[in-house]
Amino acid sequence: MAPPRNVVKIAVQMSDAIPQLIQLDQAKPLATVLKEVCDTWSLTHPEHYALQFADGHRKYITENNRSEIKNGSILCLSTAPDLKAQQLLSRLQNASREGCCEVLRNLVPLASDMTFAQEVISRDGLQKLSTIIENGDDLGEMLALGLRAFLELMEHGVVSWETLSISFVRKVVSYVNMNLMDASVQPLALRLLESVTLSSPTLGQLVKSEVPLDRLLVHLQVMNQQLQTKAMALLTALLQGASPAERKDMLDCLWKKNLRQFIYKNIIHSAAPMGDEMAHHLYVLQALTLGLLEPRMRTPLDPYSQEQREQLQALRQAAFEPDGESLGTGLSADRRRSLCVREFRKLGFSNSSPAQDLERVPPGLLALDNMLYFSRHAPSAYSRFVLENSSREDKHECPFARSSIQLTVLLCELLHVGEPCSETAQDFSPMFFSQDHSFHELFCVAIQLLNKTWKEMRATQEDFDKVMQVVREQLARTLALKPTSLELFRTKVNALTYGEVLRLRQTERLHQEGTLAPPILELREKLKPELMGLIRQQRLLRLCEGMLFRKISSRRRQDKLWFCCLSPNHKVLQYGDVEEGANPPTLESLTEQLPVADIRALLMGKDCPHVREKGSGKQNKDLYELAFSISYDHGEEEAYLNFIAPSKRDFYLWTDGLSALLGSTMGSEQTRLDLEQLLTMETKLRLLELENVPIPEHPPPVPPPPTNFNFCYDYSMTEP
């Protein structure tokens, strides 16, 4: 007879005792279960004990999380969290230095458990830890353990970072600013200051004033990836918390101190692989730097500004008066004005007054900045562009100003200028760190590409939008390759000629047209069930391989890893926490189990409980797109197993696999792409013998039936 649904068979162990094999009734109060376990071992005062998972993070079992106990789980009987917290804190207060280190070694692994953390915090544990950190009697292991325990407790979000004292923050800052410091202390101090900066504007200003940028640069130049990453994290946090004017001053200072060159040579081109966290911080640094262009992009040209009028005149003179000699010398004012209007027309402005062209935002004054940069840093290419096109009379001239304005808009869209930073993106461009003024330099390459493409297309003014579409495709395809330098970008984008773009488009079009013929569609429909079964099998295999996921804390930091996989028999999901940098665990080491039969539904995006309350701003979009949850039976209630996929592809593979596991339709974009690819290959294999044979749109007509079915055989014909 099968045991009731709410009964699980588990083992309970205790040091120096024979383990117990019991049937745990999940409907029975936990206090009653504890009393029964203690009675078996003849232990008094069961309220002084608690159950923990024996493996992994040794989480305390409470009424809220007892549903995580599955058949075969191994538990251990240990000291209750309130008593354990009291014991450790009492020893911490009166112990010697070595005794404090021993207490902290026991405290750190337990601090990640919410139940234990609440007990420590309620007994002023944070205050005791802050005293150890502020005293700084030991700048080695004890300080590192104290910082780690403090961070683990604060990450639960029970206490606000804004409650920290100024003296405490200053002491942590002093550890960052010290020259001779234990290698394990400074990354933890930097991590703490990053959390303070992101959570408290007031304390963030204190950190900004107390931590010199030069000191962060020193940490970045140490060949220690963990220290580099935490220093970059604090740097981007300070930049995000600064006002636009302060941010500009800080970035100008950093570029003058060769931060860009160091990132390019020692981080991007480092022999060691770059971590995800560092890639995210480089993306943030790139986005914040490009964000400095937003005010110019949002500001229209002021026709009454003397400075801006002089810039327009400088642009005209660089093209038509290269030697500084005015062609209008000796002419009347009206004649000179008429000459200027004509020359601005030759420059490619659509209106008689250039100010009218530059009133559009975006790109506003950023387009004028780009044109001036091109004229000053590539004067020969600028003059050749303008004079070559202004001298043509066959309507094939490429308007420089109009092209520059539209191209600036295009570059802002491709590089997401002015958009808020994503909290999870890692999509930075190595080329951005290869040289100064990268946006303007990119414009110089793009405007010459536009002129080249214009000639290849033999375009006229009516073809302007078509040319811009081709240039957008050329730039987008090349940026997607992530070239590491501007010269490499120039080489690749110039190799992608208009003819090559046409070839790519033609290939895609022929591919689409080939799959739209009715006989091909019929064949594809017959192949779909078999290929969908193949995709389903691949998705389930991917689940069996397992994957590392990151946990999101109360401040949505993705800094803890856990592993999840499907058992080979496809009946159980197994999961558990793992350490950063560790190899994926084996199935035997994963003690957490979720039977597939207990799963109710698969939730995605904003329906997930772990992102439902995060708001609806643009910064949450990436998080929503990567979030999914499994709801399952938790006694009579519903519980959730929450995921944040590392990438969009992994999100599709896992949600498809879970849908297949639950018997639902696999409806992701990745499934559609995989099915299309398999259908294309299989169709081509089936049609190999019909190469160069036209496939009719409709089947041949069936001939009419004969007038009668009286078949006749001529018996007069005899065989010889």
Swiss-Prot record:
Keywords: Apoptosis, Cytoplasm, Phagocytosis, SH3-binding
GO biological process, one term: cell motility
Domain of life the protein comes from: Eukaryota
InterPro entries: ARM-like, ARM-type_fold, ELMO_ARM, ELMO_dom, ELMO_domain-containing, PH-like_dom_sf, PH_domain
Subcellular localization, as worded in the UniProt entry: Cytoplasm
GO cellular component: cytoplasm
Keyword Transport included in the entry's annotation: no
GO molecular function, one term: SH3 domain binding
Protein name (Swiss-Prot/TrEMBL): Engulfment and cell motility protein 3
Functional summary from the UniProt entry: Involved in cytoskeletal rearrangements required for phagocytosis of apoptotic cells and cell motility. Acts in association with DOCK1 and CRK. Was initially proposed to be required in complex with DOCK1 to activate Rac Rho small GTPases. May enhance the guanine nucleotide exchange factor (GEF) activity of DOCK1.
Ranges of residues in domain ELMO: 307-479
Source organism: Rattus norvegicus
Keyword Cytoplasm belongs to the record: yes
Pfam families for this protein: ELMO_ARM, ELMO_CED12, PH_12
Segment forming the signal sequence: none
Assembly: Probably interacts directly with the SH3-domain of DOCK1 via its SH3-binding site. Part of a complex with DOCK1 and RAC1. Interacts with ADGRB3.
Ranges of residues in domain PH: 541-663
